Regions:
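The beta1-alpha1 cofactor-binding region of Rossmann-like NAD(H)/NADP(H)-dependent oxidoreductases
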Residues: 61-72, 104
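Conserved glycine-rich Rossmann-like NAD(P)H-binding loop of the short-chain dehydrogenase/reductase
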Residues: 31-45
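SDR active-site lid
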Residues: 171-237
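Residue(s) in the substrate-gating loop at a strand-loop-helix junction
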Residues: 142
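Active-site helix of classical SDR
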Residues: 122, 158
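Substrate-binding pocket helix/loop in short-chain dehydrogenase/reductase
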Residues: 98-111
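Conserved glycine-rich cofactor-binding loop
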Residues: 15-16
Length: 264
């Protein structure tokens, strides 16, 4: 008897951090994984690692903000394997600056990833998932889209766009068998802070009691959401507590964030 084909997952932002860790874990869990990011060399390294461990992988280097390029990737995935039953949107770019400190190119880049990248990949495979009557879209969100802090204007706006995409998709998909999930992580020990060494000091002091999470732990959380889809997930639990504090006492929470965050 021929064994069933392994399911297909697309992971954006797969060249490092949460995306790379998630791709490794999905491959080890029996998924055929499509790696998506802009850095071709890093993708090839990860693809080689996954193949050496016995996994099935495709590496697609592109700017996911380019809708036409995403469509071409989608066609290649369908041709080589099958439409994916999982899309993990972990691509994200950005600098934490006041708006007047941010140049137009940086603003466009931050809208490109995460928002346009997620919208393009969800759109590319939406019809396939609806026809199959199932599938999952998981988006990696930022606390900045829950409780904005000062000094990260364009970054925050781009994360709110991703949150809006998820919330709209969730409503669109009710009763279809296709799910949209938003997973919020606190600070993650990834390359972001190495590439943006001054950004850590801009996190409001009120967020200092939320522990740092590793990309590998984030990947485990995401795999848990694959197995049991939920609309919104917070990790670690202290982040959920802060979110509830913001909902119950919005004015005091905003005051604390403003007072302990970056100032002009």
């Amino acid at each position: 008897m021929t064994p069933p084909e392994k399911p297909v997952a697309v992971v954006t932002g797969a060249s490092s951090g949460i995306g790379a860790a998630t791709a490794r874990l999905l491959a080890a869990d029996g998924w055929r994984v499509v790696l998506v990011a802009r850095r071709a060399e890093r993708l090839q390294e990860l693809a080689g690692e996954i193949e050496a461990a016995g996994g099935s992988v495709m590496a697609e280097a592109l700017d996911a903000a380019d809708g036409a390029a995403v469509e071409r990737v989608a066609d290649r995935v369908r041709s080589r394997w099958a439409p994916p039953s999982l899309v993990v949107n972990s691509a994200g770019a950005g600098v934490w600056r006041f708006l007047e400190e941010t140049n137009p190119e940086q603003i466009l880049e931050m809208i490109g990833a995460p928002y346009l990248a997620a919208a393009n990949f969800c759109r590319a495979f939406m019809t396939d998932m609806l026809a199959a009557g199932g599938g999952a879209m998981i988006h990696v969100g930022s606390p900045a889209s829950l409780m904005p802090w000062p000094g990260a204007t364009a970054y925050t706006a781009s994360r709110w766009a991703l949150r809006g995409l998820h919330e709209a998709l969730w409503m669109d998909l009710v009763g279809t068998g296709v799910t949209s999930s938003m997973v919020y992580f606190g600070e993650v020990s990834s390359e972001y802070f190495e590439a943006n060494p001054d950004s850590q000091q801009y996190i409001p002091a009120i967020g200092g009691w939320i522990p740092t999470t590793t990309p590998e732990r984030c990947a485990e959380v995401l795999l848990g959401v694959v197995r049991r889809p939920r609309r919104v997930v917070f990790h670690p639990f202290q982040l959920r507590l802060m979110w509830w504090l913001a909902k119950i006492s919005p004015a005091p929470t905003r005051w604390l964030i403003a007072r302990t965050g970056r100032r002009h």
